[in-house]
Amino acid sequence: MFNFHTYSVDEVPCLLNVDTADILPSYPEHVKLSIGLHPWKVDESWQKCIAMIRKGASREDVWAIGECGLDKVHRETLPLQMEAFRAQIILAEEVQKPMIIHCVRAFDELLMLRRELETTCGKEGREPQPWIIHGFRGKPEQAKQMMTKGMLLSFGHQYNLETIRFVFTSSRPFYLETDDLHLSIRHIYEQVAHHLDVDVSRLSLLCDPRTSLFCRHA
């Protein structure tokens, strides 16, 4: 059982989202990190934040860049969000680590940036790093659109039942998370296992990013 995106240290293996200002010298062995600039926190000083993230991005226990992305609820900072997100895309490619994506009402822009990255990587003869959209609640059609562009999905407590069934039958990796909720990740695994009519043990194997996304760390 793996908690793919959380803001608090879990008892099970997890990917802990940390602020670079609060990052500790070390963490328990089962805790791995993701670091990035959340779109809600983007302001005129975003470049300083990216510089701090860059310093920590090469740590062995940092497995992903993020969460980062775009959020049109905070439309007033969207131009800055785009700049900060592009900078983190470049960083993720440099350190060869996946990205944890926060996307709210900005999927067209997200797809545009993914196409830009695919074009750049194609010219260089390499594959882009995976992007994982966390807390995905979209419909199956939107999920298919994202997956076609090489993106993966992570689901929290709330999700579209048809979508998670579609992803399950697609044989593509997907992940489960608590995000910032004070819930047990086991509760989410049990809920999803019930909806998919599978054993929790099987679901735990299917949703373990160490065997699909972070293979080099396993």
Where are these regions (language model features)?
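Mid-domain alpha/beta scaffold segments of enzyme catalytic cores
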Residues: 1-218
